[in-house]
Amino acid sequence: MPTEGSTVDTLTIEEAAAELARLAKEIAHHDALYHGKDQPEISDADYDALKRRNDALEVRFPELIREDSPSRHVGAAPSVTFSPVVHARPMLSLDNTFSQEDVQDFVAGVYRFLGRLPDQSIAFTAEPKIDGLSMSIRYENGRLVTAATRGDGTTGENVTANIRTIAEIPNELPKGVPAVVEIRGEVYMAKSDFLALNRQMEAEGKQTYVNPRNTAAGSLRQLDAKVTASRKLKFFAYAWGEMSEMPADTQFGMVQTFKDWGFPVNPLMKRLNSVADILAHYDEIGLERPDLDYDIDGVVYKVDSLELQARLGFRSRSPRWATAHKFPAEQAFTIVENIDIQVGRTGALTPVARLTPITVGGVVVTNATLHNADYIQGIGNSGERIRDDEHDIRIGDTVIVQRAGDVIPQVLDVVMEKRPAEARPYEFPKTCPVCGSHAVRERHEKTGKLDSVTRCTGGFICRAQATEHLKHFVSRNAFDIEGLGSKQIDFFFENEDASLQIRTAPDIFTLEKRQQQSLTKLENIDGFGKVSVGKLYGAIDERRSIALHRFIYALGIRHVGETTAKLLARSYGTYEAFETAMREAEALSGDAWNDLNAIEGIGEVVARAIVEFYKEPRNVEVITRLLEEVTPEEAEQPKTAGSPVAGKTVVFTGSLEKLTRDEAKARAESLGAKVAGSVSKKTDIVVAGPGAGSKLDKARELGVQTMDEDQWLALISG
C-alpha cells in the first residue's frame, strides 16, 4: 500500500503524475470488483489508504487532477446484465473519517462554512453504516415503479423485479404520500440468514458463500427473481432521491416519515448536538457491533437540518454535510503453525498460513493468505517494502492478523520479540507440491520484472489445476450445474472406473451415456441414489445450451472474469466468431488483434492471455470435444429497433461536457452500439470533445466518421 503524507512533498511533478495514473487505474479496478462484481480483493482499510494517497497527491499537485480521477467518480459502471437506469438525482458516496480528530475537523468545517460560532448549536444525526448494497426505489402515485442499484452514481442497474420479492419493502405506500417518492437505503442479508444459507449449501455439496454483503449483492442480481425471493434479503431506509414534495424539514424527521410509510429504519439512529455526544454514540455502536444481526463498518453523521444541508451543498462526489466514521480494521495476535501451498486453476502457488485458532471480529480465524513469496519476505506487489527488513514470516512466529471488510484474513506483521530461536526463513517451493512440475515466476516481456506469482508449469497434468478448472467450470457464474460441487468433482476426478471419470469438461456431458454402458452404477455408490443421480443428469442436460458469456467465462482463460466474458460475448456475438478472431490474432498483430485490443475494458495483458490460450493445442482439443456436447447461444443484443447507431462501433475521445464518459457509454450501448477504446478500421464513429488527440488523428487518417458531442446527441435523439 502507498505511504501517505510527508513523502508527497518530495515527489517531482513527473513522479506525481505517474503515481496518479497508477492510482486511477488501481482504484477503478477495485471499484469494479466491489460495486460491479461484489468480489473485493483488498480490505476496506487498504482501499481507503489508496483513496487518501490519491487525495493527498491532488491537493499537492492540483494541476495534475485527471479526468478519470477517483475523486471525480463514485462506484463503478453498471453491469451489462440489467438494463440501465439513470438516477433522477445522483447517488453520491460519502467522505470517510478515521479518527476522533477527523470527526472534530468535519464538525468544525461545517460550522466554519456556515459562519456559525461554537455556541450556535447544530444538530447532527448518527446511525450505523450498513455493509450492504445501496438501492434507490422509486414510487409514483404510491406504487413501486423502479428499483436501481447505485452503479456509478449516475446510472444504476434495473433490479425492480428482484426488489419486489423483499418482504420488508412495500409495493404500495399509504394514501397521501407525495406523487413522486424515491427511497434510498441498503439491501443486506442478516448474519443468521447467511449462516443458515451456508449450512444449506454445504449440505447440498455446493460451494459456500464468502460473506453476507457479497451474498446479498449477488442474490439481488439474479436473473431469476425466485432465487432472490429465497434469500430472505432485508432493507434499511435512510435517505431519498427525487421527492415531489418534502414531508419533513430534518434528516431525522424524514427517516421517521419513512418508518410511518412502512419502511424499516435503523433503531440505533440518534439526533445529537455535540461532537462529544457523536463520538460517545460511535463508541456505543462499536460495543454493540458484535451482537448485531447485520454487518456494519462505521457510523454515518449528517447535519440534521435540511435547510443547512442545502446551504452546505456538495463537492464533486460527496456532500459537505455528511461523513462516514469508519471502524478500524479488526486485529488479533496468533501463531503461525505451518505454511501450506495451494495450487489454483491457473497454476498459481498461493501460500496459506495455518494459524492457532483466534477470534477476530466475532469470527474464528484459522487460516490467512500470505499471497506470494514476496509477501512472506515483506515485499509488496510494486516491489516496495511493506514490513521491516527482518520481519519475514516464519513457522512459529507470533503474527498480527487483520480481518477487515470481511475480506480473507491477512497477516500484517511479525512480533519479533516472540520469534522462537529455532525459527528458520521459509523456503518457497521450486516445484509444484501436487504434481512435481517445475514452479516458476514469469518475467514480463516489456518491463523485465518478475511476476509476483509463482506458477506450476504442469498444466492439465497437474491434478490441482485440472480439478480447480473443473470446479470453476461448474461454478455458479459459469455452467452452474446443480449437484456438481467441490466434493463431487473430487470424487469423479479421482475415480478409477472409466465410466465414472470426469477429468475434463466434456466428460461431464458424456457421464450418463458411459454409465448406461457400465455395470458400476452411480446410484449404488454411497452418497448418491436413484433420485439424486436422476437430478444430476437432468441438471447436466439443462446446460447443453448456455449463454455465450457463461461459456467463455467457464473456459477458465487467465484474466477473463465475468465482466470480461460479457464484453467478449457482446463484441463477437457468437462463439464461432470469437474463436475465429482469436485464431486470426495468433501473431499478436493484424486486424483481429487490433479489434480485440480496441474493446473497451480489454487491455493488452488480457488480450495476450486469450490469444495464448487458443494457441495451446490441448485447450483447442478440449473445446472441440465440448462443442460436440454443448451449444453456446448467440449473445443477446439490446432491442434497438430504429436506432441510428445499432451495430456500429463508437469511440469517445477528449472531454465530454454534457455527459460523463460512463453515461455516454451506457447510452450508446443501450442503443445497440459497441463502444471501443481505440480506433481501428472497424470503427464507425468517433465522438471527439475538447482535448481529443491521437484517436481523432487516426480516425481522420482512416476516413472514419467524426462528430462532436452535440452532433452525437442530435444523432441518437433522432
UniProtKB/Swiss-Prot annotation:
Keywords: DNA damage, DNA repair, DNA replication, Ligase, Magnesium, Manganese, Metal-binding, NAD, Zinc. GO terms for cellular component: cytosol. Its cofactor is Mg(2+); Mn(2+). The active site is at residue 129. Residues 640-718 form the BRCT domain. It comes from the Bacteria. Belongs to the NAD-dependent DNA ligase family. LigA subfamily. This is DNA ligase. It comes from Rhizobium johnstonii (strain DSM 114642 / LMG 32736 / 3841) (Rhizobium leguminosarum bv. viciae). The gene is ligA.
